[in-house]
Curated annotation (Swiss-Prot):
This is Melanoregulin. The keyword Iron does not apply. Changing E180K: Mildly reduced ability to promote lysosome clustering at the center of the cell. It is a peripheral membrane protein; Lipid-anchor. Keywords: Cell membrane, Cytoplasmic vesicle, Lipid-binding, Lipoprotein, Lysosome, Membrane, Palmitate, Phosphoprotein, Transport. Belongs to the melanoregulin family. Changing D177K: Mildly reduced ability to promote lysosome clustering at the center of the cell. It is found in: Apical cell membrane; Melanosome membrane; Lysosome membrane; Cytoplasmic vesicle membrane.
């Protein structure tokens, strides 16, 4: 089940405690000393060719659905004869998906910078397998906000499966009391436009790939 459907099923209005997840011990405190952002993304890779947005074979970054999709495409491509028709097709799909992922991340960064997080934007967006929710009590709110962003703005391409990493990013915004402001700016910068093809900024010639969750 894709993350979008999972979020829908989780964001019910029942009064039970089924959605409350047990608190897990933090491997890295989210707030440390006088700098509330210093520990966000403690394993942040600043080299674009090594981070989770372009190189999925880093073992820290193959657990999320979209990382596995990209990783599997690369594995299949590498099994083909280089420069063959199938190899070129897969290579183009890999390039397209990477560009889409980079553009989505850039959209989030632009909004964070507009909120005043110029120095903290990259670390706020950094997610690895060591990342955890800051507070299990925020889980429901983070799910609802992520769905709201997906359904009421165009910050994500319409046919793009929601990424688990952005649930953690939204959780961080909630911890900083910046989630609602983030949504307001996202609505202004990337308003929902019915009928507009799901092409990302700067990639008007690239086709949108309906990558399903594995």
């Amino acid at each position: 089940m894709g993350l979008r459907r999972w979020l829908r099923s989780a964001c019910c209005c029942c009064p039970c405690r089924c959605l409350e997840e047990p608190a897990r011990p933090e491997k890295e405190p989210l707030v440390s000393g006088n700098n509330p952002y210093s520990s966000f993304g403690a394993t942040l890779e600043r080299d674009d060719e090594k981070n989770l947005w372009s190189m999925p074979h880093d073992v820290s970054h193959t657990e999320a659905d979209d990382d596995r999709i990209l990783y599997n495409l690369i594995v299949i491509r590498n099994q083909q004869t280089k420069d063959s028709e199938e190899w070129q097709r897969l290579n183009y799909d890999i390039y397209t998906l990477r560009q889409i992922r980079r553009e989505v991340r850039n959209r989030w960064r632009r909004i964070l910078e507009d909120l005043g997080f110029q120095r903290e934007a990259d670390s706020l967006l950094s997610v690895t397998k060591l990342s955890t929710m800051s507070d299990s009590k925020n889980t429901r709110k983070a799910r609802e906000m992520l769905l709201k962003l997906a359904e009421e703005t165009s910050i994500f391409p319409a046919s793009w499966e929601l990424s688990e990493r952005y649930l953690l990013v939204v959780d961080r915004l909630i911890a900083l009391d910046a989630a609602e402001d983030f949504f307001k700016i996202a609505s202004q910068m990337y308003p929902k436009k019915p009928g507009v093809p799901c092409l990302v900024d700067g990639q008007r010639k690239l086709h949108c790939l309906p990558f399903p969750s594995p």
